[in-house]
Amino acid sequence: MASILSPVPVLAAGGIADINPGLTLWTAITFLVMLAVLAKFAWGPIVKMLAERERSIREAIDSAKKERAEAERLLAAQKESLSKAQREAAELARRNQQEVEALRQELTAKARKEADELVAEARRQIAEELVKAKAELKAQVVDLAIDAASRLVKANLDEKSQRALVEEYIAQLPANRAA
């Protein structure tokens, strides 16, 4: 009974020369029959399942490659779009800077022109006022000379009296101007 429960001592006791040819033959026949049954009934579905699995894996790989290529294409398009947007923004900023500079120069030139026109107008008015003032002064001088001459003629005075009269008249001049 101990030998049935423990297979190791039995094999060790019999050795390699104790191979049973009948058992080996039946084992081989059973293996071949099972192989034939499996080949007939199971091999086709197994091969078909493996082929289907291989096809689905291949399709998944192809799909992944296509999706990767599409993602790379979209990434390149996105980079190009971003680059284009950056170029357009830089161009817009450059144009705006040029427009601002042109407007600044235009406004500066306009302000300078207006200032020059105001200065010219002021000079013209000053010149007119100067001409008017000279004309008024000339008229006053003429009036004074006529007045002085008429007083001299009326007084018909000697030289000393004439000198005193002119000095008195000159002393009255600031009073005449203020009035």
UniProtKB/Swiss-Prot annotation:
Protein name stated in the entry: ATP synthase subunit b
UniProt similarity note: Belongs to the ATPase B chain family.
Keyword entries, A-Z: ATP synthesis, Cell inner membrane, Cell membrane, CF(0), Hydrogen ion transport, Ion transport, Membrane, Transmembrane, Transmembrane helix, Transport
Membrane topology: Single-pass membrane protein
Residue intervals passing through the bilayer: 27-47
Record flagged with keyword Transmembrane helix: yes
Organism taxonomic ancestry: Bacteria, Pseudomonadati, Myxococcota, Myxococcia, Myxococcales
Domain of life: Bacteria
Gene coding for it: atpF
UniProt GO molecular function: proton-transporting ATP synthase activity, rotational mechanism; proton-transporting ATPase activity, rotational mechanism
GO CC annotation terms, alphabetical: plasma membrane; proton-transporting ATP synthase complex
Species, as recorded: Anaeromyxobacter dehalogenans (strain 2CP-C)
